[in-house]
């Protein structure tokens, strides 16, 4: 039964009472939330109550659920790359569904989101739906939601990228790139390394046997053996620092600081634009395509390429193996 208030407490919001040492808010779900001391002014109590109500509402919507997921052990077990991707996907999803109660989200709502988002990017729509499903799966296993609204909602069919970077294209961009982009291009190509793994590379990864790389996405650990060309790329990276600047980053700015993805991308795009102006060719490949070129150019079987690239399955390797195969023709005279 709701406690009656005296006349002098009539100014207080519903479910706010004087406790033994503080004003308290008793929400419908039970419990008591301490607002402020008993000597607080009326406006301070009202403000504390408003903040408490908003905090509770946030906990009860999808934004609150996603926030809890991001603080969970399951999320911390994911690779740093996946964590960053999920945070990026969450911004798009929560801009639409953030204030919705998790149990009120239905498959038809997810489908509508997919259709609208897919009009711009089917790939991103798929990734964002996969993130949302992962979040709901975590919540469902803990009794926080009644269902996963993503279950049964079809993803868009994706066409695997098949862009192969020709040697002359690589050379054209390389020759117009600044030293830090040149060094990153070579390390990525020679080691089949992702951009993120190259930019986060530190000097303690440079070993006697080669370059130690733990892939940010798969956590696979490898040491890429030295070749003369790879040593030359590392020597180029050493020249990036100026004066007595010391940096732990292999690919660093003149002041020793590491490059952000966006900062590095600007140098990459400038080099590609300069090469386009000279060659009058499209050069429509991305930095990530250099990893595919590396795997495609590596001589050997699919299993050999898998060992080289660090992929967990041969199917993943096939996605990156894009070089058109030269096969015998019929010789019938």
Describe the residue ranges of each PLM region.
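Basic, Lys/Arg- and aromatic-enriched nucleic-acid-binding interface segment
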Residues: 126, 141, 145, 151-195, ...
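N-terminal core-binding DNA-recognition domain of tyrosine site-specific recombinases/integrases
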Residues: 73-144, 258-263, 284-286
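C-terminal catalytic core of tyrosine-transesterase DNA break-rejoin enzymes
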Residues: 123, 183-186, 190, 197, ...
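Active-site/catalytic core of tyrosine-dependent DNA strand-transfer enzymes
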Residues: 227-281, 294
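Short, polar N-cap/turn motifs at the start of nucleic acid-interacting alpha helices
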Residues: 205-208, 301-321
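DNA/chromatin major-groove-contacting recognition/catalytic segments
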Residues: 172, 222-238, 307, 315-333
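N-terminal DNA-binding module of tyrosine recombinases/phage integrases
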Residues: 5-6, 14-23, 27-108
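Conserved tyrosine-mediated DNA breakage-rejoining catalytic core shared by Y-recombinases
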Residues: 160, 169-172, 191, 196-242
């Amino acid at each position: 039964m709701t406690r009656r208030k005296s006349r002098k407490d009539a100014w207080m919001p519903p479910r706010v009472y004087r406790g033994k040492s503080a004003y308290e808010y008793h929400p419908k779900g039970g419990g008591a939330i301490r607002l402020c001391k008993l000597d607080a002014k009326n406006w301070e109590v009202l403000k504390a109550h408003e903040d408490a109500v908003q905090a509770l509402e946030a906990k009860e919507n999808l934004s609150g659920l996603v926030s809890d997921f991001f603080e969970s052990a399951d999320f911390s077990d994911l690779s740093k790359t996946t964590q960053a991707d999920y945070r990026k996907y969450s911004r798009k999803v929560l801009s639409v569904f953030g204030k919705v109660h998790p149990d009120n989200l239905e498959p038809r709502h997810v489908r509508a989101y997919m259709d609208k988002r897919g009009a711009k990017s089917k790939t991103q729509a798929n990734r964002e739906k996969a993130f949302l499903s992962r979040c709901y799966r975590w919540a469902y296993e803990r009794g926080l939601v009644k269902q996963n609204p993503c279950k049964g909602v079809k993803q868009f069919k994706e066409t695997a990228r098949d862009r192969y970077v020709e040697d002359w294209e690589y050379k054209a961009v390389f020759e117009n790139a600044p030293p830090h982009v040149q060094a990153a291009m070579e390390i990525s190509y020679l080691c089949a390394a992702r951009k993120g793994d190259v930019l986060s590379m530190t000097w303690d990864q440079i070993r006697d046997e080669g370059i130690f790389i733990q892939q940010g996405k798969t956590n696979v650990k490898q040491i890429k053996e030295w070749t003369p060309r790879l040593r030359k790329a590392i020597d180029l990276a050493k020249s990036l620092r100026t004066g007595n600047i010391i940096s732990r980053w292999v690919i660093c700015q003149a002041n020793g600081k590491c490059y952000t993805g966006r900062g590095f991308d600007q140098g990459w795009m400038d080099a590609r634009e300069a090469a386009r102006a000279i060659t009058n060719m499209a050069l429509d490949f991305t930095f990530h395509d250099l990893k595919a070129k590396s795997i495609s150019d590596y001589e050997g079987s699919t299993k050999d390429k898998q060992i080289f690239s660090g992929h967990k399955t041969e199917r993943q390797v096939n996605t990156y193996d894009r070089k058109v195969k030269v096969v015998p023709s019929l010789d019938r005279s």
